[in-house]
A protein has these predicted regions:
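Charged, glycine-enriched surface loops/patches
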Residues: 54-61, 87
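Active-site regions of metal-assisted phosphoester/phosphodiester hydrolases
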Residues: 1-32, 45, 63-66, 71-226
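Glycine-rich loop at the start of a catalytic domain that most often binds anionic cofactors/ligands
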Residues: 48
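Active-site neighborhood of divalent metal-dependent phosphoester/pyrophosphate hydrolases
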Residues: 36-43
Length: 226
């Protein structure tokens, strides 16, 4: 099973990046794609950004789910809407959006996207995340891990964790999960030479391949096989 994860960074420099993203996805041919910072801007398209990308792929994904639920005012005074999306070659059986706890001084409400996908006759559970870009990201990871444990679920957690040093929080997950960074040291946010994007797989799984997609966004795409 091949999976790609990419923070789209909305429509920034979209005229230069759109074709690169489409070309990359056509090349890697992942079974499932997870996006963060997916915009919906009706001035650009009646489709949200993930749907727009999917419509232009040479082999589009049959199944998709999006949660465009976050609104905020940009620096130029315009309303912006964004969220999380998944594209899948396999049937999406169930999806769920959960709002994470919000600290009073945190500017944005964060959500997670749980999707259950039928892969080869077996139900595989995923959680797509985009945590706060501040110290609360550690707490949000702990909240997600606790929720999954309390539900007695096995999930692959993927997305923009906004945690630069994943080893500093490894005590939260190391007994149950393997991190992508422990398998391959990589940079996912080149402008700061940082690694904010991660994949956590249950410890009984293993990564069989891992690669980066560069110059698609301010984040690099992560593509991995398990």
């Amino acid at each position: 099973m091949k999976i790609t994860c990419l923070n789209l960074a909305g429509y920034k420099n979209w005229s230069n990046r759109e074709s690169l993203i489409i070309k990359y996805l056509d090349k890697v041919q992942s079974n499932i794609v997870f996006f963060q910072e997916v915009k919906y801007n009706p001035d650009i398209s009646i489709l949200n950004q993930a749907q727009l990308i999917n419509s232009k792929l040479s082999d589009s994904y049959q199944y998709s789910q999006s949660a465009i639920s976050r609104t905020y005012i940009t620096s130029d005074g315009k309303e912006s809407r964004e969220g999380l999306s998944v594209l899948s070659k396999y049937p999406i059986i169930e999806s769920e959006i959960l709002v994470l706890k919000k600290r009073n001084d945190d500017h944005h409400t964060r959500i997670i996207q749980n999707v259950d996908i039928l892969v080869g006759g077996q139900l595989q559970k995923f959680t797509n995340v985009h945590f706060s870009n501040n110290s609360y990201s550690d707490e949000q990871l702990e909240e997600v891990l606790s929720l999954i444990k309390e539900r007695n679920q096995k999930r692959i957690i993927v997305g923009d964790f906004n945690i630069a040093d994943i080893n500093s929080v490894s005590h939260l997950f190391s007994e149950r999960y393997i991190s992508s960074f422990s398998q391959s040291k990589y940079i996912s946010f080149p402008s700061e030479a940082a690694t904010f994007d991660h994949i956590l797989i249950p410890s009984e799984y293993k990564f069989t391949s891992f690669s980066l997609g560069e110059n698609l966004s301010d984040h690099n795409a992560l593509t991995f096989e398990i």
